[in-house]
Amino acid sequence: MTSALHQSSIKSLPLLGRGKVRDMYAVGDDKLLIVASDRISAFDVILDDPIPGKGQVLTELTEFWLNKLAHILPNHSTGVRPEDVVAPDELDQVRGRAVVVKRLKPILVEAVARGYLIGSGWKDYQATGAVCGIALPAGLQQASKLPQPIFTPAAKAEFGMHDENVDFAHVVREVGQEMAERIRDVTLRLYTEAAQFAATKGIIIADTKFEFGLDDDGTLYLMDEVLTPDSSRFWPADGYRVGISPPSFDKQFVRDWLETQDWDKTPPAPRLPQEVLQKTAAKYREALDRLVA
């Protein structure tokens, strides 16, 4: 197996912060170096054991989708090679897992598109018959395909907290009517086009979240990670049945194993066995191979 990177240590650039998976460094005043580590989180806890190759999969898939969907919306790409902005002894930390992107002002709304009823959307529907204020037909089951994709935004939570589903009016209050409508329309267009393509590869994209940002002129850009197993639910089409939660190309092995442990879902998490690490790495890799092949 490839060696895993739990945390980058780029000394030649100023560190701006670390998220659950990505480390962010400043490249001058107008660009960022974003390094996708192999960290994995479950139940909002970052685990000590990285998943070998995960950062490369996330980076390659994001680049694939950014190129495929560039006609819909401009994105954060700069064309600058990560290898050209770090010191020679730091090349191994960025190769295949880092990007140099435009420095944008992030819009603090998670732009979620759902084509199927699962996860928090399924819970909302069971309680209210609606998701994020959007009424849905009666009688839908878990994993039902929706009549058409819906825009179900979430308010970005503080680190370690769950994002909270909100209605469209919340987005309007945050960014104004015109920008809210643009974000909704672009989100649904990106999702629909990606889902149609993935279906030809035997993958259902049940839902996904996009991140958007603005430049100094107020132009909207697609940013951060795009249509990866971390930001989306990918289901194998041949394993899909209404009424059950289908298997997915992500950290389900990790979550399932942790559920069998005597753990209260606060740090530190139990150490993961090799089998779980290897199976999870293989699932991420399979998603990439299926989509990009």
Swiss-Prot record:
InterPro entries: SAICAR_synt/ADE2_N, SAICAR_synth, SAICAR_synthetase_CS
Superkingdom of origin organism: Bacteria
One GO molecular-function entry: phosphoribosylaminoimidazolesuccinocarboxamide synthase activity
Signal peptide: none
PROSITE patterns reported for this sequence: SAICAR_SYNTHETASE_1, SAICAR_SYNTHETASE_2
Gene3D superfamilies: ATP-grasp fold, B domain (3.30.470.20), Phosphorylase Kinase, domain 1 (3.30.200.20)
Keyword field contains Cell division: no
GO biological-process terms attached to the record: 'de novo' IMP biosynthetic process
CDD domains per UniProt: SAICAR_synt_Sc
Keywords: ATP-binding, Ligase, Nucleotide-binding, Purine biosynthesis
Pathway participation: Purine metabolism; IMP biosynthesis via de novo pathway; 5-amino-1-(5-phospho-D-ribosyl)imidazole-4-carboxamide from 5-amino-1-(5-phospho-D-ribosyl)imidazole-4-carboxylate: step 1/2
KW Chloroplast (keyword) present: no
EC class: ligase
Catalytic activity, EC: 6.3.2.6
GO cellular component, as recorded: cytoplasm
Enzymatic reactions: 5-amino-1-(5-phospho-D-ribosyl)imidazole-4-carboxylate + L-aspartate + ATP = (2S)-2-[5-amino-1-(5-phospho-beta-D-ribosyl)imidazole-4-carboxamido]succinate + ADP + phosphate + 2 H(+)
Assigned protein family: Belongs to the SAICAR synthetase family.
Protein's UniProt name: Phosphoribosylaminoimidazole-succinocarboxamide synthase
Gene name of this polypeptide: purC
